[in-house]
Amino acid sequence: MAHWRTPSRIFLVGPMGAGKSTVGRELANLLGLEFIDSDAAIEARTGVSIPWIFDIEGEAGFRAREAAVIDELTGRDGVVVATGGGAVTTPANRDLLGARGVVVYLYTPVSVQLQRTRHDTNRPLLQSDDPEARLQSLLAERDPLYREVADVVVETTGGRARSVARRIVEALQGQPS
């Protein structure tokens, strides 16, 4: 059996509430890589919150900022990057993610997303009268995009972040290098 080499760039995609940030930290720790959350990077650069950007610039303004950050982060080596849930809606982001590293789709059913995000006021797209319907709509729109760009798909239900991170490593080890 050939020796497995840790990818130098791992990008996590998936819906809000999938655990991209939590699992990403664990995965980076397991593999000795740096963890970067693209939304946190946007907030650090702008000095304002994601909801503020949505309020002032709208989703299009946010997506433009996100695309610039994705372009930069996907060029770094030795990283696990957790992308925002909607990063895949921009074709250029999908191209960069797919071309520059290994993409892991953290699949999470809507019921689990709802449970994990129900008290989070920092998610502009969930500020609606029916968050469950909104999550279902977003997943219906984005699931094909996540799957299109993903090298591997790992479900995040039924396990702690560390066990999900281990499942990702196992899935990656099964990938051709």
UniProtKB/Swiss-Prot annotation:
ATP binds at G17, A18, G19, K20, S21, T22, R123, R160. Substrate binds at D39, R63, G85, R142. Catalyzes the specific phosphorylation of the 3-hydroxyl group of shikimic acid using ATP as a cosubstrate. Its EC number is 2.7.1.71. It comes from the Bacteria. GO terms for molecular function: ATP binding; magnesium ion binding; shikimate kinase activity. Monomer. Its cofactor is Mg(2+). PANTHER family: SHIKIMATE KINASE, SHIKIMATE KINASE 1, CHLOROPLASTIC. The gene is aroK. One of its GO terms (biological process) is aromatic amino acid family biosynthetic process. Mg(2+) binds at S21. It catalyses: shikimate + ATP = 3-phosphoshikimate + ADP + H(+). Belongs to the shikimate kinase family. Binds 1 Mg(2+) ion per subunit. It is found in: Cytoplasm. One of its GO terms (cellular component) is cytosol. The keyword Lipid biosynthesis does not apply. The keyword Manganese does not apply. PROSITE patterns: SHIKIMATE_KINASE. Its main location: cytoplasm. This is Shikimate kinase. It comes from Halorhodospira halophila (strain DSM 244 / SL1). The lineage of its organism: Bacteria, Pseudomonadati, Pseudomonadota, Gammaproteobacteria, Chromatiales.
